[in-house]
Structure formats: C-alpha cells, structure tokens
Regions:
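Cytoplasmic helix-loop-helix junction between adjacent transmembrane helices
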Residues: 109-146
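A membrane-interface helix-boundary motif in multi-pass transporters
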Residues: 40-48, 77, 143, 160-187
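MFS 12-TM fold signature
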Residues: 53-56, 85-92, 148, 188-192
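Cytoplasmic membrane-interface "Motif A"-like loop-to-helix N-cap segments
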Residues: 71-87
Length: 192
C-alpha cells in the first residue's frame, strides 16, 4: 500500500507534465512566433525564442547546485518545491493575458515558468527518496512517470481539440483557444 505522500508525489506528475506537453512542446513556440512576435523577422523571433530558453536554462544550471545544497542542509525542500510550482503556475496563467505583439513580456513569463518548472522538478525528483523505500521506489517512480504521461497527454489532447475546433468550445479563434490552453495548464497543474 502506498503512503499519502507517495500518492501525492505520483499525482503531481500528472499535473506538471501538462506544462511540458502543452506549453513547452506544443503551443508556446508556435504561438510566440505567430502571435506575440508576428511583427518580427523570422530569424529575429527564432533567435529571441532561443535566447529566452538559453537564459532560463543557464540560470537553472548555475542555481541548481545552490538549491540542492540549501535543501540538503535545511528543511526547505517542500517549501521551495511548492514555491517554484506556484510561481510557474502563475507565470503560465499570465500568458493568457499578454496581448499580441508583446513578445518580450511573453518571453519573460515563459522563461520564469520554464525555470521554476525545471527547478521544481529537481526537487520533485529529490523527494522520491523521501516518499518511498528500497522495496517500492521503482514502483512509485514508474507510477509517477506513467501518470505524468497520462495527465500531460490528456490535457494536451483537450487543448489540441480546442485549437482544431475552437467554436465547439465556445471560442472565437485559434488564438483564443491557445490562450485558454495556457490557462487550462495552470488550472490543471493546481488541481494536482
């Protein structure tokens, strides 16, 4: 039987994986180019998106050892994990409100969300040893992995359907559907 902490650990993957599928992999890069950076030259918007991701990941590269060391010597793992998750959830929700042409705002909030998502995942992985033991660590990890695919995939399918048939969902355009998809990721993630 799994502990409540192990079940919560497994469920969380179903929520935050929606960010990876809907935002990172599917909609943000395309929407950045077509909505927020549509007035820029193709090479420029591609470069800006690349730089935004690079900066976010470099900050993660340089801060992760400090986050890891801090959580090793203090009882801040859950606090930081919750904080990173909350900041990422709010940053993704903000994407809904950013108007067309505001590429810098979109890139900043995406960069914050991406950084906090990845930093939170580092702590999430670290917590596996806290919610499991030698006999069930592989099973709990596998359940989390599977539930992440299930949760992220399910919301992505709904979001993809929203962009294919926005009128079916009461939306006026594909752009509105994508914006609602960002908001749905925040809600989905919060629920898990």
């Amino acid at each position: 039987k799994l502990s409540a902490e192990a079940k919560a650990w497994i469920l969380y993957d179903g929520g935050n994986s929606a960010f990876a599928t809907t935002v990172i992999a599917a909609f943000f890069p395309i929407f950045f180019n077509d909505f927020w950076a549509s007035a820029l030259e193709a090479e420029v918007k591609t470069a800006y998106l690349g730089w935004g991701l690079t900066i976010s990941n470099l900050v993660l590269l340089f801060t992760s050892p400090f986050i890891g060391a801090l959580t090793d010597v203090s009882r801040t793992t859950k606090i930081l994990f919750t904080g990173f998750g909350a900041i990422s959830i709010v940053s993704v929700a903000v994407l809904y409100f950013i108007p067309a042409g505001s590429w810098l705002q979109a890139l900043i909030f995406f960069g914050i969300a991406n950084y906090c998502f990845a930093a939170g995942n580092t702590l999430y992985d670290k917590m596996l040893v806290q919610v499991s033991n030698e006999s069930n660590i592989a099973r709990i990890s596998s359940y989390g992995f599977a539930f992440g695919y299930l949760g992220g995939g399910l919301l992505f399918l709904i979001n993809a359907a929203m962009t294919i048939k926005p009128e079916f969902f009461g939306l006026s355009s594909v752009a509105e559907a994508v914006r609602w998809s960002f908001l749905s990721v925040s809600v989905w993630w919060t629920l898990f």
